[in-house]
Amino acid sequence: MKRTINEVVGSTSVNTLDSSIAKKPVFLTKKQREELALKRRQDQISEQRVRREQLGRPEPETEDVSNGDTNRDKDRDRDRDRDRERDRDRERDRGRDRDRDRDRDRDRDRERERDRERDRRERDREPDRRNREKEREEEVKAREKARVEKLVEREKEKELDAIKEQYLGGKKPKKRVIRPSEKFRFSFDWENTEDTSRDMNVLYQNPHEAQLLFGRGFRAGMDRREQKKQAAKHEKEMRDEIRKKDGIVEKPEEAAAQRVREEAADTYDSFDMRVDRHWSDKRLEEMTERDWRIFREDFNISYKGSRIPRPMRSWEESKLTSELLKAVERAGYKKPSPIQMAAIPLGLQQRDVIGIAETGSGKTAAFVLPMLAYISRLPPMSEENETEGPYAVVMAPTRELAQQIEEETVKFAHYLGFRVTSIVGGQSIEEQGLKITQGCEIVIATPGRLIDCLERRYAVLNQCNYVVLDEADRMIDMGFEPQVAGVLDAMPSSNLKPENEEEELDEKKIYRTTYMFSATMPPGVERLARKYLRNPVVVTIGTAGKTTDLISQHVIMMKESEKFFRLQKLLDELGEKTAIVFVNTKKNCDSIAKNLDKAGYRVTTLHGGKSQEQREISLEGFRAKRYNVLVATDVVGRGIDIPDVAHVINYDMPKHIEMYTHRIGRTGRAGKSGVATSFLTLHDTEVFYDLKQMLVQSNSAVPPELARHEASRFKPGTVPDRPPRHSDTVYIN
């Protein structure tokens, strides 16, 4: 049954009232719902019209209610358009939000990337900053320490002065009392310099003055013979002048007396010492004690020991055999060096020798020639005695030095036919042992490899009575003291020299002879000398540990980061000359060589990490001038002779001054000049004192930073860093 809209509305209102009581739902059809919605719409339009009329607004055009379907379509279209427009607005807003979010994310990523880059730069700068801060802190601490020490020293001086004044009494200044004679002395109107009076006697106008001849071997610098001759000449001139002034002719008796006086002045007595000729113009028989003293002073030779023979002045006076003299001439040695002058005569007398000489002074020939002369007196090697081992052993700290000594020994033994064998690491020990068992007169070895051969029975030393320790201090520093002692203990001890220093040695008898050469004398070397050497003669050429005067030393203070740039600058100035760059570590050696190679330099390396074959190739290439820059560790710093090295650069300063001496000794050899440049930083304070002393002794320039540094004032270990005692009073401003 269908109902009208009014009935529906009425029933709805009634049902609404009843729903509050019965709460019974009313179900409407679709048409009823549409009519209800249209009714509500008309009610809303009526309400809006009433509201506009109340507000005085014009009434909009009303819609025809009768056109229900048309209005509904329009409403649907309008709602759809409105929804579509709203969707577009929302989509547009969402697009703007997405763009804004994307831009915000992009900005955030940029900021994060900038933060990461800034953190990366900070991390890169952090080591340099820490180093600068550390250096700054060290400088501040050093200045503060120096200031405190100065204050403490000043207070100690004040305290000492107060104690002296309390117990000894202070010196009171005395008031000068003017004597009456001085108080009332007559004052002239002129000065003493205006006095024109002269001594009337001519003898007193030109008084005779004795000339002191210091440095010519005279006592107090006075040569009595020269003084008498000058006095006689002065007297003759004065007499001639007086006779000429008075017009007196010299009588024959006076002339004869004058000749007698001149002859007496020229006559030698027991106190006179002849100065007529230099020692180089005299024969060996004419040399006096004074001549030998001048000779030793000229070559800076000093001895310590008893019954010391005279040094040799030339190869002709050396008492070497003709074969050795021919080999010396063939090697191009025209004049002996000071260490050769002093050590060869000692070796020919079978004396134990400790030689201390500067680097590059010819120490190799100083012990090789006496060794060859000693072997020449022994029976030749045969099948019967080949198994007893060599006649002589030479020990060196490094392979390169051992091979260099082998080359020199072969050169000097050219006319004698002696066999020389080197035993070093990096090669087959079986092959080296076979060479020894096949027979050789001389073995040149490193201590470690030689003791291995002895322990494995590849070699024996049953007839070895001549041993040389070259660069003994270096072997001790490298920890070879037990190996050296083991080799010396393996030698026969039946023919040791007598312990009595005054007892003469029998020249026909074979004694055990030990040569020890070193640039310095550390305690380890002294221990070996006391145990194994009998009455040794210590020969010192120059000052122990001193560098040759042919080396020009330069020290440059800088930061660690400035080293490579300064190295390139020095190498650019080098031209075609050769240079050795010393560093402390193998890693740094390879790194610097790689960077120099990239920069276009002809560079090679040499350090302990290379095989023996690689080391020989590098060294041979540098000697042959295929490379002009050698970057090396201290393996090259001792004993190795590389000719014509113009410049030595200490890229890293060594920890001990002895190693510095040997490093720069690679230049300035064989009478040629050289340059040594050292890069110094504030991390090298342990060598500041010794380096400053060496620069001062060699008349080299001392950088102001080194001269003023606290570490250069005191030798390390002599001023302990102790806290102030309770009795100390320290004032700090």
Swiss-Prot record:
The keyword Plastid does not apply. The keyword RNA-binding applies. Residues 566-710 form the Helicase C-terminal domain. Residues 39-147, 705-733 are annotated as: Disordered. It is found in: Cytoplasm; Nucleus. Disulfide bonds: none annotated. One of its GO terms (cellular component) is nucleus. ATP binds at residues 357-364. GO terms for molecular function: ATP binding; ATP hydrolysis activity; general transcription initiation factor activity; RNA binding; RNA helicase activity. Its main location: cytoplasm. One of its GO terms (biological process) is positive regulation of primary miRNA processing. Belongs to the DEAD box helicase family. DDX23/PRP28 subfamily. This is DEAD-box ATP-dependent RNA helicase 21. It comes from Arabidopsis thaliana.
